[in-house]
């Protein structure tokens, strides 16, 4: 599945891998629209396959809005995320990772099983831990 800069790039027996690539959308409404389309379909795909782990490779380029990050990550359920799924995001670019870490921390504090990493191997190791 591919919507804008968001693509499911692989599925294994227990992990769906998602790639965010290209230029970051400039306007928050563009980002929100893309997320509203992508995540409900991805969540449904995971449910239909019995998959409870998602690896997100965030390779977006460009400016990142801390306001958007905060608003998005405090409303994950409204965007189609599922609390029964564990999400690991890999962001190699330090500035983007620092800003996204705020959103991930807020979501985690709200009970979401979500983490952020600088390397794929660390994210995969975390995803492999037993689910609650």
Model-identified regions with their sequence ranges:
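Amphipathic, Lys/Arg-enriched alpha-helical "gate/interface" segment within cytosolic domains
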Residues: 2-132
């Amino acid at each position: 599945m591919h919507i804008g800069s968001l693509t499911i790039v692989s599925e294994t027996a227990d992990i769906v891998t998602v790639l965010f690539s290209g230029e970051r959308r400039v306007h928050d409404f563009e980002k929100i629209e893309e997320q509203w389309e992508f995540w409900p379909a991805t969540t449904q795909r995971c449910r239909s396959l019995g998959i409870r782990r998602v690896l997100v490779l965030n390779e977006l380029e460009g400016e990142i809005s801390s306001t958007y990050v905060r608003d998005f990550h405090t409303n994950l359920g409204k965007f189609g995320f599922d609390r029964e799924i564990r999400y690991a995001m890999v962001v190699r670019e330090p500035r983007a990772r620092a800003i996204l870490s705020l959103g991930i921390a807020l979501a985690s504090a709200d009970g979401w099983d979500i983490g952020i990493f600088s390397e794929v191997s660390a994210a995969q190791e975390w995803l492999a831990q037993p689910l609650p």
